[in-house]
């Protein structure tokens, strides 16, 4: 009888299939050796039908034996089959379901290492290159390496770039490849491929200590959705080796440049070094790398930079020649590569190895999605697919291009370890200011640095004190995986969060689309509002990361677009979903804090909705007051000067709509620079008018009682000083107040640019969240250069595997291409790979975008016109609306300062308590 589709077998039964040095096998060899039937004839004979139950009880009886020679042939074939099983990978992907073992069934074909025996490298044997499977004695320094198909042969010259990546089909049909039959598991292909010999030589001591892990790269062609990966029996190599994953780090890539990716990958390796150096920890130690899985998810294999793939291939986690576009007629949705490497890349794009560089092994998983579906969908593959297989304790997300601190990953994990009620965390994100702060000379970077520091020192501590982190995107954040999982009968946060994946529902609302682009903020909300749970969030400033801020207005617009849109849409979503807080089990005080935070969050977003009108009204009422004789610093030019600046401001506001709707930022740099310069000049004029109308009347008066009261000074200067005092106070507590002196001027001058240019551009591109992904209902030819495979009647597929010289040639080509790459660019145009939705969908989303922008602009226009008509420009001190705007900002800032101070004080007290506790423990330790 022939083998059917592979069944599942548990690890404890596998040893039964692996022959040892038993008397049966030795007698069989002796018997065959005296026979006229040689081994090659026996091995090349017909497929085994069954075997003798006497010698091998796991086989069925022979149906028919015609001659002694046939017996010898079948016995020889049986012996060869069992020997190959002995060299198979002992932790097969089939080991996920336990069942009873039937000794009368034929042996289960395990997952073979492609083209190489999977026995651990033996120092006393090596492969005879002149025999298919023979052995010969060798020195103790030699290792069992390749089968004859890929045995050591002269290494060819490195292939050209086009040969390595675009001529795979031609290579597969050449004599440099051989065929291999491997089993299919639920329609998905999983194979263990040998790694190049040159790569093994770069792994250093790790190769000798973990030869089996360093000699093979596991490739899986995933044909199912990420939610079905676990049910289909797929297993990660970390699970097969029985490792307990504490942290899974996710790094998503799309069209980012090589330099950004190298910075993040290098910083992750440095964090692994720190974890391995914590020899006194109860969890971490010398083998800490076994508890960390680094996942790189690429959003579309046609959009990623080629030199990024060269880097991944140089590390060893990527091989371009093994990908399969279709498996058994089903389209491959993602290509997954698993490898453990000690090769790292530094920030200067230099490869470092374990020898002499102090690198530690890093377990890497590369998931290359076949289509570009966005970062949101990449997180779905990580959380619903990869994390469900790895089962980590903590899932961390690192923004591409972020340079993590050397202990960031440890402190992120420690926050979850100390407090069991923390469901999510976010770290501290800083702007790279260069050596001695030289980059702060650029006003755009200085303005972003000021805003980011206020975010770190004021907003994040306040949010952490309340329990929900609602602010802008972070460079490092994470979740406790248990808090994300389903708990029957209630679905977990992931079920609701990824239910709105655009791959599943392409016609959802435009605000909902942008809300889900908020990523961690929305998932944070799902965690704290989980039914019958009481998770809260925490800010961990020790988990720090540094990013490079855009140094031009065009770059700022590109980076701020999704942040502004997702922030507003998230506010709408939180307001609508507010009553989900009532289904949680938070304590009353925590529930009260979350309720107050949600209300303040909603009011703040409402004020920001009218920020265009509010700034124009403040400019109009303050500057118009200086054009009259009582407060006139310009003489006869006061009124004309005010009108000139007023008309320039109005024209600039309308011009921003034209620039946003008709151009990309990088194509109109000059116009953006001119508008930014004009906005800054207007801001200088506005600030001068504020100080003049506030201080001149105070200077001319002899009555000191009017310093604070119903006057210009109290409304304008004093309120602004209170806000600045709050900023300085929390920054001083955080031991970082210097940015106020170096960046506040640039921040004030660019304020109208942030209010008008950034907001208008972002909202005019509100529809980008809905049309920049591939359409799941359209078919595109992605299979260029990638082969297919189909399953035969026995549950196997035949694939083409390159020999050793081809592996080395491709690897050396990747090294050469990576070494010669000069990619330091930040911008990369991938419009050729952005497959748009049908025109009807684009029209639908653009229509919604137009309506929303129209409502937003008209609302601000009506508010400005009405208030200008209602209030007299000469009587600003009686303008109740402007007082409300200024003092509401003061109230928001003061409230957040109280929360931030509470958070910082709590952390200080906690540190002191832990220090005292540790001292007492040492003192009382006998």
From Swiss-Prot:
GO terms for biological process: cell wall organization; chitin biosynthetic process; mitotic division septum assembly. It is a multi-pass membrane protein. It comes from the Eukaryota. Residues 44-55 have a biased composition (Low complexity). InterPro entries: Chitin_synth, Chitin_synth_fun, Chitin_synth_N. Pfam families: Chitin_synth_1 (PF01644), Chitin_synth_1N (PF08407). Keywords: Cell cycle, Cell division, Cell wall biogenesis/degradation, Membrane, Septation, Transmembrane, Transmembrane helix. The chain crosses the membrane at residues 564-584, 599-619, 641-661, 671-691, 721-741, 853-873, 885-905. Its main location: membrane. Residues 1-56 are annotated as: Disordered. GO terms for cellular component: cell division site; cell periphery; cell septum; division septum; membrane. It is found in: Membrane. Plays a role in septum formation. Has no chitin synthase activity. Belongs to the chitin synthase family. This is Chitin synthase-like protein 2. It comes from Schizosaccharomyces pombe (strain 972 / ATCC 24843) (Fission yeast). The gene is chs2.
